[in-house]
Amino acid sequence: MAFRIASSPFTHNQQRTQRIMLLVILACLPGMLAQVYFFGYGNLIQVGLASATALIAEGVTLSLRKFAVRTTLADNSALLTAVLLGISLPPLAPWWMVVMATVFAIIIAKQLYGGLGQNPFNPAMIGYVVLLISFPVQMTSWLPPVPLQTIPVGFHDALVIIFTGHTPDGYTMQQLMHNVDGISQATPLDTFKTSLRSGQTPQSILQQPMFAQSLSGIGWQWVNIGFLIGGLFLLMRGTIRWHIPVSFLLSLMFCASLSWVIAPEKFAPPMLHLLSGATMLGAFFIATDPVTASTTNRGRLIFGALIGLLVWLIRTYGGYPDGVAFAVLLANITVPLIDYYTKPRAYGHRR
């Protein structure tokens, strides 16, 4: 009888990179379906466009670097970056913005640092921030949720306006953004901040049609609940750990609740922070990126809490309506320092 001699390790682990990436993409589906239901097919088209661009950009870059293209693309990391980017962008953002952000995320933020596992910053958020700084008007132009739309936008309408700038009937993005009251639509966070700075009270702001069914804005609470469900799925599968999402959400809720209790006439209610914008997407899918996040348990708690604090500060005092992307990138800068001071004590050594 012949015996096969194999070298260690002899343990088996199903958590391969390819499988992890696919699980994260699968976990995004509940939030994506909520986006489609309340805001139309735009984000679905953006995800498809970003995915095609990401695979082409990664393939070309790998070929230039003399890497095995097919093997490397099979890890699905480029696909996940594209999905997260497509989810984050406004549904009807022009096609060239999607391509530009994806190329920047894959080539500049990932491959120029050495590829998967070498990048210090989250590639999807780098691409998003490049667009937000360069094209702030387009990046804050969101469709009203379906119940408030005066001009219904179907799949064909969304596809045409993304590539041409207007629907087949000749409607522009600015016309589509007006809700049933004739008011130009923005995200709930943007609307609340702008209205508050114009002198309105929180009570009067929350009487607007956007907030009629929920403090977090029509549709937005279900989008966030969808990503929460996906995040819990990842936790149960052991794909991510609880430290970053929990500390992120607790830190954000603590800051929002404390400020709201002290001065409710000046600050947004906690539920608006919790279930609006990219809160759950950021907590479970973006901040938990194992490459750019802290690697120790104590470090993860600090990292998540720092992001929650930064999100609240940017949303409250910053010039942009949602601060998740900036908060994650700023926290990425601190990861080496956090890991240095939270590294566990080696056995047999005092420190």
Swiss-Prot record:
Its cofactor is FMN. InterPro entries: NqrB/RnfD, RnfD_bac. It is a multi-pass membrane protein. One of its GO terms (cellular component) is plasma membrane. The keyword Methyltransferase does not apply. It is found in: Cell inner membrane. This is Ion-translocating oxidoreductase complex subunit D. Part of a membrane-bound complex that couples electron transfer with translocation of ions across the membrane. The lineage of its organism: Bacteria, Pseudomonadati, Pseudomonadota, Gammaproteobacteria, Enterobacterales. The complex is composed of six subunits: RnfA, RnfB, RnfC, RnfD, RnfE and RnfG. The chain crosses the membrane at residues 20-40, 44-64, 89-109, 123-143, 215-235, 244-264, 267-287, 301-321, 322-342. Its EC number is 7.-.-.-. It holds the Pfam family NQR2_RnfD_RnfE. GO terms for biological process: electron transport chain; transmembrane transport. The modification FMN phosphoryl threonine is found at T187. Keywords: Cell inner membrane, Cell membrane, Electron transport, Flavoprotein, FMN, Membrane, Phosphoprotein, Translocase, Transmembrane, Transmembrane helix, Transport. Belongs to the NqrB/RnfD family.
